[in-house]
Every structure is written in structure tokens, then in C-alpha cells.
Amino acid sequence: MGFELDRFDGDVDPDLKCALCHKVLEDPLTTPCGHVFCAGCVLPWVVQEGSCPARCRGRLSAKELNHVLPLKRLILKLDIKCAYATRGCGRVVKLQQLPEHLERCDFAPARCRHAGCGQVLLRRDVEAHMRDACDARPVGRCQEGCGLPLTHGEQRAGGHCCARALRAHNGALQARLGALHKALKKEALRAGKREKSLVAQLAAAQLELQMTALRYQKKFTEYSARLDSLSRCVAAPPGGKGEETKSLTLVLHRDSGSLGFNIIGGRPSVDNHDGSSSEGIFVSKIVDSGPAAKEGGLQIHDRIIEVNGRDLSRATHDQAVEAFKTAKEPIVVQVLRRTPRTKMFTPPSESQLVDTGTQTDITFEHIMALTKMSSPSPPVLDPYLLPEEHPSAHEYYDPNDYIGDIHQEMDREELELEEVDLYRMNSQDKLGLTVCYRTDDEDDIGIYISEIDPNSIAAKDGRIREGDRIIQINGIEVQNREEAVALLTSEENKNFSLLIARPELQLDEGWMDDDRNDFLDDLHMDMLEEQHHQAMQFTASVLQQKKHDEDGGTTDTATILSNQHEKDSGVGRTDESTRNDESSEQENNGDDATASSNPLAGQRKLTCSQDTLGSGDLPFSNESFISADCTDADYLGIPVDECERFRELLELKCQVKSATPYGLYYPSGPLDAGKSDPESVDKELELLNEELRSIELECLSIVRAHKMQQLKEQYRESWMLHNSGFRNYNTSIDVRRHELSDITELPEKSDKDSSSAYNTGESCRSTPLTLEISPDNSLRRAAEGISCPSSEGAVGTTEAYGPASKNLLSITEDPEVGTPTYSPSLKELDPNQPLESKERRASDGSRSPTPSQKLGSAYLPSYHHSPYKHAHIPAHAQHYQSYMQLIQQKSAVEYAQSQMSLVSMCKDLSSPTPSEPRMEWKVKIRSDGTRYITKRPVRDRLLRERALKIREERSGMTTDDDAVSEMKMGRYWSKEERKQHLVKAKEQRRRREFMMQSRLDCLKEQQAADDRKEMNILELSHKKMMKKRNKKIFDNWMTIQELLTHGTKSPDGTRVYNSFLSVTTV
């Protein structure tokens, strides 16, 4: 609405008037047709009518109206009277100054601020009124007892009613309290929303951190794979480059049956005649002070041509091992040794490393050692440390002779360039970049980033990664190390512009953004599944041991070799990682002696081989042993009393009845006797609590096994990483070596790419590898390794397993020497299963059937005398992850859960394993509205459709109430109703448990308060029977069993009645 015309001083131009309200324009708006109206007038009109008020055009919307600023400024310069002119104000001001005048005008209306006085006065008269004339002004406090303020009007009237005043005051306080409560609730609601928002942000940040960790782990895995290819070229240099080689003939003699060196290489198989440049048998390692390390002996990288006249130039790895094993002394070995090129070079006495904060020496051997570094387990990133020193065990060779055309191959890789700007506040701040470079005369003179300080400027920037190559610094192309050192250590520059290059990653990381929440859940479940697999491997070892005890004619090949010197293959056990650089053969003798004297503390040897994806990978050979000085009492960190307690608990609930093919539970003998012991009620209560606890553990284990089965089906492909390591074989007579070729290992879990149970480390400080427990090895498949009742009754037959069986790893333990060995996987036993490796696989001897009723009797004694029990860990054994992971099974509760889960699943294995369910992709919606894709069984959709179809059919069958009754047709329960039933059942079970616990607590309190002597069951029964001794023998509460057991006795023990009891059996 506009301004009134009579308020303006003087005449107003008609063009400044609104055509709707006929007043002076207030905030004028113009239409597209040129008419001008007040904003308060034209907006309601356009919204309601949808046209111009002048009816000059068609449809009009509010968006088409525009402000007329020049006209508005012209109107604001008009003189206008004060709005309170009627109250006595005679001021005339400019329209644009009117709001400021109204705020301080003395004639503006104002209300008295005293409570109870609502008089409206002029602003200039309010203060005088409140001070002198207001009847509601306070003049003191009531002296009659209420103590409330007394107003001037009440004092003039002679006082006030205290009760009425107190009630009014109380009502005012309650109203204020209610307002405060309401405000408090609003603030609490606002704070709760804020807290949820912050928690969500924190969770998102943690999730992003975990995803970043996984992303860098994948990148590190790719770098390790690329460096593996370099190390393979170093181990087997390509020919055809005109290297200088010379042929040498050496004579070796065994020292205690050992030659003291390792070999690698050989043709992949006997049938493969496509010779490649990497064929040949090479010396990979030489033991210090061994026969091969003497003067005039072998050297690393020597190629073995003949052994005692037997040509090994085109032999396989197994043929070379057999040749050294069967060779008679003296052993004449002909080798080809490469000599350095005749050119000038500077030996790398000291390699350079430049860091703007610290300086550390780093050599080419450190870079090559990165191929053996293990990546951290998700989601925790443990930084690895480069070793401080790495002594060279052989003379210097030109690296270009070994690497060959690797630089040209790397040049062909696609590079990703990125420019990074780093700023520091002063010259004392450190960039935190540790760069490394080669100091020998090679072609690659690049500068690489090897480490980033986590608290530095570069780490906070986040764009620079380890392994990046620095191309330019501040626009200057880096040509050599001197330029890089000068530019990075310059104190004048505070701004650094780095141009870095890195290979483009070929990994598809889109799945991580789409399904990262479910994938992180799978990480945790995968760790739990790994623990379950390890527990089930223990159970499998117990069953295999029991089978071996009962099958006298069957002998394990690994058992025959467990106490012989052929473990070192005649070539020598050259891995010093478990013996701290001591002689391998002497320790073998000591192990044999210990094993013969202490069967439970014998040698424990784990040997496995690996199939790699590359057919040109060279096989390595090595062995590792666990010391024989740890007995069964110091192997797993569980106290003796805890083991005994849970052993009894498992005997109570988890033992399998031998005569029952379905494996039903039944209580064992020792605890049955304890249950019937009448000496103490506390004993019965304790046994009852343990029984309830065991039932709860059983339920938890079944639920966990079911969840892991579902997760395994959903994320089958998500956790399988490419493994590009060496195939590793033992040079010992390990005939079980080929039976484990499908045991894969994750690159991030192995410090040396070797598939023996422990690493082929260059020193005893290296971290060993551990076996991968793949998500494909579900609990259901792992349970198939345990003999269950079937029509065949045998373990080794493929008919007992379905086609869904994939990779099953079982461990057997020899009862004489306690040597755990591996039995072959089902992939080898199944003739229909395709083999992915060219390596030949040996069969696993004869097998005998093991019935499932042996599970309970075999499990309990073995668990009691298990060699994996207490944590007295030798110092040299603490370096092995595979050893330590067995040690870390500290909780007997988890062990009991695994066993009970196994027993419960064995019931269903008598029938053939069903094939894998068909899956389909489903789009799911999270609570935050984001979408993700996951796999779901087709069976769920079919069942849902079938349920709907049944419901439709039944709803239209007939109108006869009797025909559609639940007694005849049954009732269909929907999914929601079934969920409600489960909730009710859980609530009822919880109430029953609570009532039982309350009753037991009440009994305990009554017994504690009762000072009389506790009577046993017999005395209570006698007392009950003799209450009515003179009336009748039987009462309503006596049973026939009580009468037969106790007779009719008085409390003093004398027999009162001797009635005749006749029992008729129908």
C-alpha cells in the first residue's frame, strides 16, 4: 500500500501516484507493458488475476515484474510529516529519513513497564509516570509473612491478601517453568540433531580413511608386482647380450649330509620343450661356512650345467633336486659363471639419500627389497621400515647386465603427470620428502620419492605419493642428483613447484565407491572367517590323526620323511631365518633326537607350494622349520585351568554320540556325576550356568557361520587380489609339495614371495608369509574336510563332495613326532576340476574311511593334549606370522564356538553338497538415500513370488467359512508376521531366562540366611514321606521311583513301613 497524500508537505506529482490505491507509490514495480504500481498492490492482483491491472495484455506472472529504482529514489526525496503528527509531533523530514525519526520520536506511544500497569503514554512521559504516578510501582515488601513485593496502590489501600498474591506468584512461576521446559526440549532436540550430524561426519571421515588405506594398499600391491618382475630379471638375466661367461668345474663334499646352497629355475615341466631364455638351474643362496661357501666353491647366480656328468642345462627343478640327492661323493659340478664387463665404474661405497628434514643412506638393494615387503592388513596402515644396512654377499656386477631391456619397457608405460605446489612459511620448515636415486653408472638417472613424513607439508597436501618420480623442480628439469639436492635444500625458496610422474593405474576402483560400506563389513567378517578356518583346521588335524591311529596299514609320506636327513635334500637347508644363522644339518640332528624322545614336541614342518599366474615364473626352493624346543604346554596362550574348564564344558554339550549317525549331543561322564552330586546346591547352579553359556555360544556360532556364508557369496570376487610372485619349491624330498599347489597367498601377507610356510628371507629378521584363507573357503566347505556319515564313508572319494567344493586345506598331525602336514585339496581329488597350473601334482597315498562318530572321542583328548596351548614362545619363532597367528588363538570360547559350529554343520553333510545358488544383481537403497548394487539369490525372489501366488489362489478358493478355515488349509504367515513371531519368541526366552536366574538367586539368598544344616536330597525325601506317617504310605507328591529308591523311612533311619509294591508292565 502507498503513502497517504495528506502526509506530504506540498503537492505531489500525479505520475507518482498508484493507479490501484491512488496513493503515493511505495516500493514501485513496473509491468512489461509499462504501468507502475505499488508492490503491496500489484503482487496480490497478479497472483490472483494473472494479468496486468490495466487489462492491456494477456497472462502476467509475478516473475515478470521489475523494480523502478530511479522512481523510488525520487519518491524518497519528498518531504513528509511525522506519523505521530496527531499526537503532537510537528516535524517534517525526507521520506528516506522517516524510519530513523520514528525510532527516537518523543511523541511515539510507549507502555508502562511495571507489571500490572497497562497504561499507554508518550515516550517522553514514561519515565516520570513509572517514577511518580504509577500505582503498580513497588514500594517495599509485605511484612505479613508472604515477603512478596508490595505496590503503591496496595499500600494506599491498606495492604493485600497474601494467600491470593502467593497463588498468583506461584502460577507465574509455573508458567515460566513450563516455558523453560519447552525451550529445553527444543534445545535438546537441536543438540541431538547436531550430534547425529557430527557423528555421521566422523563416520564418513573414518570410512574415507579406510577406503584411502585400501586404495594405497592396492597401489602398493601393484608396485610390488612390478618390482617382482624386475627381481625375476635379476635372478635370471636374459641371454643374447654378449655377456662374458666362463665355465668352471667344482668339486663339492657333503658336510653332515648337506651341501649348503639353494637353487632356483628349471623348465616348468618335462613335456615343455619350448625353451625360453630364463631356463636353467641357478644358485640363489649360499649358507655361510657351508661346503659350497668354501674357497673355490659356488657363487650366487652360477648356472649349473652338469652334476657328476648328468646334464642339467634343460632339466626341470625336480630333476635337478633328484640329481643332487642321488649324486655320490665327490660331487663334480660344472657351472657357468658370469664375469663383470671390462669397463670403468665406481663401486657404490656410499649411496646418497636427500631429505629436506633428515638424511639416510639407501641402496639399490633396498629398492629391490621392496618386492618382498608385505603390505599392511586393512584397515590399519602400519608403516614399514627399510633396513639400515644390507651387506653384499658377492662381488659387484653391472646392474644393466641383469635388468636388460627393462628401462625401454618402462618407457613404454603410460605416465600420469601432476604439478604440485608446496609452500612453507619460513626456511626452517621441512617439506618432508625423502628422495632416492641410483649412484652407479646406469641409464636411469631419475629422482624418486621413497618416503613422506606424515606430519610434513607434503603429507598435509596429500597429492604426492611414495614412488613418484620428480621431473621438474620450480620449472627446472632435474638432470642429475646434484641439481635435485641443490633445489630441494635451497633456503631461499619458500615455494616449490614439483612436476611429478607416476604410472597410470589400471585398477578399477568404481566398485569401492558403489559398495564400500558392505565391503568394509566384509573385511571384518573375513577376519572372523579366517579365525574359524584356523580352528577348523585344528579339528581336521585331530580327525586325520585319529584315522591314522586306527588305520595301521596307511602311512603318510610326510611322516616317513619327518625324522630323516633328506629334509635338506642333500643340497642343504639354507634358510637361516629360524635358526639364527646356525648350521641346518646340526639342527636337523637335534630335532630328530628331540622328536624321538618327546613325541609331543617334535618337529613341526609346514611346506606348501604355490601356483602363480605367470607361466614364466621361476620356481624357488627353500625350507623352514619351527624349533623343537617348545612343548605342548607352551604353544598357545591359554591358562591350564581355562583349558580344563572349557574341556569339561565341551564334554557336557558338544560331544558327539558315537552310536548316533546324526551326531546328537549328550552329556559326558565326569559332569554327569557332578550333576547328581548331592553335596552342594552351588555345584548344580554352576553347572546349570555353564550349560546355559554353552547353549548361547552354540547359537552364536551357528548365526555367525550363516552370516559369513552369505557374505562369502556376495563378495566372492571382491577380495581376490592378483598374486604375481615366484613359484617356490623345496629342494628337499618333499613328495607332498605338489599336493598343495592350489594354496594361494596374498602378496600383502608375504615378506618374501615364497610359498613355503616360512619365508626365504635374506636374513632372520624378515617377516614371513602366511597362508591365505580365501573367502571361497566357507565354513560349509571347510567342514566337508571332516568325515561325516555318507554312503561311501570315505574322505578321499570325490563322490562325497559336490561340485561346489573349491579349495579345502586340512592339516594332519602325526601322533609320533607331532608334525603337522597338509592333505591335498579337493581340487586335486576332483578329476572334473580344471587345473590352472602346469605343475604336476603327486597323489596322496592311500586313504581310509573315517566315520563321523569318531569326532567327539578324537576331539576332546586332542584338545586336552594339543601342542598349541600355552604361549611360551621362543624368541626366534616370534618372527613368523603363520606361527604367531596360531599363537593368537587365545580365547577358548572362540575355539569352542568353532567346534560346535563344525559339529552342527556336519549333520547336513551326509547328502551331496548342493550346487551354488544362482544369483542376480539388485539395486539397494541405504538409509541416507544412496544406492548400491549387490548380489541376492534368485531363490528369494522365486519364494516371494510363490508366496504371493499362493496367497492369491487361497483367497479366491471358496466362500465357505468351513472350507477356508485354518484347521483345513493352514495359515500363510507373511514375512513381517514371521519376524514378529521371532521377536516374541526371543522375548519369551529372555523372560524364561530371567525368571530362572531370579529363582536361582532367591534360592542362594535363602540358603545363605538359613543357619541350619543343609539336608541332602535323601533327607528331604524322607522328611516329605514321613509327614503323614500314621495316615498313609503314599501321598499326592510321592513317585514310584522315590519309594523304590528310599523306602519308607523315618528321620532316625528306622524302617516304619514295608508295604508290598506291585508293578505291572503293559
UniProtKB/Swiss-Prot annotation:
E.C. designation(s): 2.3.2.27
Annotated compartments: Synapse; Cytoplasm
Residues with PTM Phosphoserine: 427
Record bears the keyword Lyase: no
GO molecular function: ubiquitin protein ligase activity; ubiquitin-protein transferase activity; zinc ion binding
Zn finger (RING-type) location: 18-56
Catalytic activity: S-ubiquitinyl-[E2 ubiquitin-conjugating enzyme]-L-cysteine + [acceptor protein]-L-lysine = [E2 ubiquitin-conjugating enzyme]-L-cysteine + N(6)-ubiquitinyl-[acceptor protein]-L-lysine
SMART domains reported for this sequence: PDZ, RING
GO annotation, biological process: neuromuscular junction development; protein ubiquitination
Biased composition (Polar residues): 554-563, 594-603, 755-769, 845-855
The PDZ domain, residue ranges: 249-339, 419-503
Compositionally skewed regions (Basic and acidic residues) per UniProt: 564-582, 744-754
UniProt-annotated stretches for the region Disordered: 545-603, 744-778, 808-863
InterPro entries in the record: E3_ubiquitin-PDZ_ligase (IPR051971), PDZ (IPR001478), PDZ_sf (IPR036034), Znf_RING (IPR001841), Znf_RING/FYVE/PHD (IPR013083), Znf_RING_CS (IPR017907), Znf_TRAF (IPR001293)
Coiled coil start-end: 679-704, 975-1025
Pathway: Protein modification; protein ubiquitination
PROSITE patterns in the cross-refs: PDZ, ZF_RING_1, ZF_RING_2, ZF_TRAF
Expression (tissue specificity): Widely expressed, including in the heart, skeletal muscle and liver and, at lower levels, in the brain, colon, small intestine, placenta and lung. Down-regulated in ovarian serous papillary tumors.
Family annotation (Pfam families): PDZ, zf-C3HC4_2
Keyword Thylakoid: no
Zinc finger (TRAF-type): 100-158
GO annotation, cellular component aspect: cytoplasm; neuromuscular junction
Task of the protein: E3 ubiquitin-protein ligase. Plays an important role in regulating the surface level of MUSK on myotubes. Mediates the ubiquitination of MUSK, promoting its endocytosis and lysosomal degradation. Might contribute to terminal myogenic differentiation.
Subunit structure: Interacts with NLGN1 and EFNB2. Interacts with UBE2D2 and with MUSK via the first PDZ domain.
Domains as described in the record: The RING-type zinc finger domain is required for E3 ligase activity.
Protein name per Swiss-Prot or TrEMBL: E3 ubiquitin-protein ligase PDZRN3
Organism this protein belongs to: Homo sapiens (Human)
Lineage: Eukaryota, Metazoa, Chordata, Craniata, Vertebrata
